[in-house]
Amino acid sequence: MKDKILFYLDADFTHFTLAHFLQQKYDCEIYAIIDITNKPKEFFLKQKLVNFKKIWFVHDNIKLDNDTVDLEYLKKIEEEFGLDLWKIIINDRIFYRFFNFHKFSRNDLLSITEQFAKKFLKILNDIKPDFFILEQPALFHAELLYELVYNSKTKCMVLSQPKFGGKSLISESVRRIDNIETLENVPFTNRTENELMEYLKRKSQRKIFKKYYENQSNSKLQFIFAGLRYIGNNNKHEETHYTYFGRTKSKVVFSTLSGIIKKKIRERYMKKKLPKEFQEKMPYVYFPLAVDMERNVLIDAPFYTN
């Protein structure tokens, strides 16, 4: 019997490409749950590069018009899969503190959770995949699906970024090496501890990200063209994707311009007021300027978001 492999695909085509080459080298049945906006749907419906046995689109038929929520069903899901649904919900960048376009009610959150749980479990029960291949989840629905699969008999293969810049890790858990509980007892074989630390400094994620943003994010002309394309497009995402609820064009433009102005004001203040020389002998408290909307301080650290 052929292995059944379920892929989670999004706007990053890494896993679509993986599915394409995997199918050439391994005789298996490939399925896909696809998390994209409306416009790219046509590509996945017509493409012939990957022979998917069946595909599903994440946001299809997820609505906010459900007045009732089946709390007993959600309780059953928590007990069966060992989940704390509120912990996942409250640490999502869209549902809680960081999404300024729409405020979800308690009933909204539970209704969306119930709909996604039923949808995902029906897919999993229908195909019973042997493997689930995905990138590290970033949003609530992807994390919920991952948790449901992880706590079943299906083998997860999560592509994530370790602390070494330019490197990737495939494991069952995000950023954790399989079968290793702690790194303290792992012997150094090919490199000494000091050599590994030097390697870590050379392969810094910060350097990789800085180079990327310098190449991709500094063109004011591209920024203007992107804004004009956005204003001219007939987008309906705010009607079909909960991650876009309330994101009208006027609100998005205002939020973007407001963010640019605030950044300039704060940057000017920091350059003018904050000391630039570090006094090593003076007692200090280290307070990093955290990026709250990233997974590493939300889903990965659910009790440290304040």
Task: Describe these PLM feature segments.
Residues 7-17, 134-136, 295-302:
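A short, glycine/small-residue-rich beta-strand->loop->alpha-helix junction that serves as a flexible
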Residues 267-281:
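Short amphipathic alpha-helices and their capping/turn segments at secondary-structure boundaries
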Residues 1-12, 34-36, 105, 133, ...:
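Nucleotide-activated donor-dependent transferases that construct or modify glycoconjugates
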Residues 14-17, 40-41, 140-143:
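Short, well-ordered alpha-helical microsegments
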Residues 119-180:
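Conserved nucleotide-sugar donor-interacting segment of glycosyltransferase catalytic cores
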Residues 279-306:
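Active-site donor-nucleotide binding/catalytic segment of nucleotide-sugar enzymes
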